[in-house]
A protein has these predicted regions:
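Class I SAM-dependent methyltransferase SAM/SAH-binding core
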Residues: 58-104
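Short catalytic micro-motifs in class I SAM-dependent methyltransferases
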Residues: 119-120
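Class I SAM-dependent methyltransferase Rossmann-like catalytic core
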Residues: 1-44
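A short, conserved alpha-helix within the catalytic core of class I
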Residues: 123-134
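Short alpha-helix
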Residues: 156-177
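Conserved beta-strand signature within the Rossmann-like core of class I S-adenosyl-L-methionine
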Residues: 138-149
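A conserved beta-strand element that flanks and buttresses the S-adenosyl-L-methionine
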Residues: 116
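Conserved class I S-adenosyl-L-methionine
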Residues: 49-58
Length: 199
């Protein structure tokens, strides 16, 4: 894969922003709870003293469900300032640092404990580059991503299981779309990769 150009990426962000405008807040709650159950995590208890990076968190990122129990929380969200100010405030109120830039362009000079990709890699400059950066800089990488073979304005990339296995090896499972009411209709790849298992 090679990066899409910046103009194409920006148009994808605009289209994705429009999609989020149509979602009810309850949809984010269902998504976060379902992802947490599938990955076997307790948001409030499992991340104390951890440095967490959530990529493309949207207006109601999963990190909000930690209620600030992390050591350091970072959200990389290029759209954050397009939403009403209270969205930014919700993150800042629990101590989350917000970065308004593409994840691929970050210089991460410390190893973080966790990097999360939940429904984001279809919208980025380069999915492989993002995953490789996370692998290099994170002790744990958590993934829940829709699989798709078509592209559109908001989704410039197709996503297959091989996108993840080519970077991390076979670490995940397939979620069958439509099996949880109010949640993903598409099949998804999910799992947790541990650097300690791959040394």
């Amino acid at each position: 894969m090679s990066r899409i150009d910046l103009h194409r990426w920006q148009s994808a962000q605009t289209a994705e922003f429009g999609h989020h405008q149509d979602l009810r807040m309850s949809a984010y709650s269902i998504a976060t709870k379902t992802i947490g159950n599938l990955l076997g995590i307790d948001y409030e208890k499992d991340f104390k003293d951890k440095v967490i990076v959530e990529v493309g968190a949207g207006p109601r990122g999963s990190i909000l469900y930690t209620k600030g129990t992390f050591k350091r929380g970072i959200v990389v969200e290029p759209l954050i300032d397009r939403w009403p100010p209270e969205i930014r405030k919700d993150y800042e109120d629990i101590g989350v640092e917000l970065i308004v830039a593409p994840y691929e362009d970050l210089e991460i000079d410390e190893q973080v404990d966790e990097t999360w990709f939940f429904n984001v890699v279809q919208h980025v400059l380069d999915p492989t580059e993002q995953l490789e950066l996370a692998k290099k800089t994170s002790k744990v990488v958590r993934v829940f991503e829709g699989l798709c073979q078509t592209t559109d304005q908001a989704h410039p990339w197709t996503v297959s299981e091989e996108l993840f296995t080519n970077v991390f090896g076979d670490f995940g499972k397939i979620f069958k779309g439509g099996t949880v009411e109010g949640f993903h209709s598409a099949d998804c790849y999910y799992g947790t990769w541990y650097a300690s298992d791959n040394v």
